[in-house]
């Protein structure tokens, strides 16, 4: 908590996201999620630290009470990813969010594929809900150009994943068919 306190003591910072590690990573599905959080999410959040678009998500997020009070009597919404939405609203309000690798929060991973798919479906659906902030992010003077690009790719990816997957599958299929016909 000392590292989080140091981050929150920085001027203009109202929230902090810590690194997340998976505690029960002895099973393959949990191990893969640990790689996702410890490597991929860590690299993304470290980059976001530089461009000013650190996101809040799940465990390991800390927000000052005074920061939450700035958002009114009900700072959290009914959004499925209320943590992500809170981070977006803080950015729009010009409140800094920082990421720290030094403080680590551990959590249990979902070890059943059905539960993992349900969890990730909820996350994607929540990102759809956060799409309503795209116009505000684009118009905001509080969000940097690189930060905006990061927000856009994050919020638009659920919308683009299926169509892009179909396009890639068609191109790959055509490539295979044409290569077989050419022999």
Model-derived features with residue positions:
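Long helical/loop segments within the catalytic core of UDP-sugar-dependent glycosyltransferases
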Residues: 3-79, 121-132
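Generic beta-strand/beta-sheet core signal
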Residues: 18-19, 100, 154
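Generic structural signal for helix capping and beta-alpha/helix-loop junctions
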Residues: 25, 107-108
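Charged, alpha-helix-enriched surfaces in structured cytosolic catalytic cores
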Residues: 27, 81, 85, 111-115
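Basic/Trp-rich segment in TM-proximal cytosolic loops or flexible interdomain/linker regions
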Residues: 51, 111-183
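Short, solvent-exposed loop/turn segments at secondary-structure junctions
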Residues: 68, 105, 161-162
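Residues that scaffold the ATP/ADP-binding catalytic core of kinase and kinase-like folds
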Residues: 70-71, 108, 116
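Catalytic donor-sugar/metal-binding loop of nucleotide-sugar-dependent glycosyltransferases
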Residues: 84-105
């Amino acid at each position: 908590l000392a590292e989080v306190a140091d981050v929150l003591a920085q001027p203009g910072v109202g929230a902090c996201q810590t690194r997340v590690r998976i505690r029960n990573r002895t099973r393959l599905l949990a191990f893969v999620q640990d790689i996702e959080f410890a490597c991929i999410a860590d690299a993304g959040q470290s980059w976001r630290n530089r461009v000013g678009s650190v996101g809040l998500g799940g465990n390991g997020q800390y927000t000052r009470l005074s920061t939450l009070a700035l958002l009114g009597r009900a700072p959290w919404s009914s959004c499925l990813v209320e943590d992500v939405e809170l981070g977006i609203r803080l950015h729009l309000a010009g409140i800094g969010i920082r990421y720290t690798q030094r403080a680590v929060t551990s959590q249990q991973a979902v070890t059943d594929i059905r539960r993992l798919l349900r969890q990730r479906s909820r996350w994607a659906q929540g990102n759809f809900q956060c799409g309503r902030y795209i116009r505000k992010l684009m118009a905001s003077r509080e969000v940097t150009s690189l930060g905006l690009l990061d927000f856009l790719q994050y919020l638009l990816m659920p919308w683009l994943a299926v169509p892009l997957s179909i396009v890639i599958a068609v191109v790959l299929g055509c490539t295979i068919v044409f290569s077989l016909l050419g022999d």
